[in-house]
């Protein structure tokens, strides 16, 4: 039986794609290419433990994405959550004051210019 081998891309609509690209490029360091998107190479040697991308449908009434009303949330892997959040705050981005520490690592959040909640994840060392 054939099966999917992983996530091939994440595609979504934006009210102001250029502003959104600038936010992700300038504040989060996403390597936006000339064609308008970004590619992230996936190599297991980049991982500090299990190498995976999580796919998980949440219940329609979840509050986990709040205050965003979007039906999705992107999670980006970062090396230093504290440094990333400080960088975002210094740029005036709306960063959630809460940080979660747990067995899966550390989590922080920021809202992008279109009101989407973005999760930042520092895997456990």
Where are these regions (language model features)?
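Vicinal oxygen chelate
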Residues: 1-15, 33-35, 43, 61-125, ...
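Pocket-edge structural micro-motifs
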Residues: 42-44, 59, 122
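Sterically constrained small-residue positions within well-ordered secondary structures
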Residues: 1, 48, 65-67, 101
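Short amphipathic beta-strand starts and helix->beta connectors
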Residues: 55-60, 93
């Amino acid at each position: 039986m054939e099966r999917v081998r992983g996530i091939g891309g994440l595609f979504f609509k934006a009210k102001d794609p250029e502003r959104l690209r600038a936010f992700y490029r300038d504040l989060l360091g996403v390597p936006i290419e000339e064609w308008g998107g970004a590619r992230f190479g996936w190599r297991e040697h980049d991982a500090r433990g299990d190498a995976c991308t999580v796919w998980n449908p949440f219940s329609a009434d979840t509050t986990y994405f709040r205050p965003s009303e979007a039906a999705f949330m992107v999670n980006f892997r970062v090396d230093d959550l504290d440094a990333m959040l400080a960088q975002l705050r210094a740029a005036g981005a709306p960063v959630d004051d809460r940080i979660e520490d747990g067995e899966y690592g550390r989590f922080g959040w920021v809202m992008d210019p279109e009101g989407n909640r973005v999760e930042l994840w520092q895997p456990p060392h």
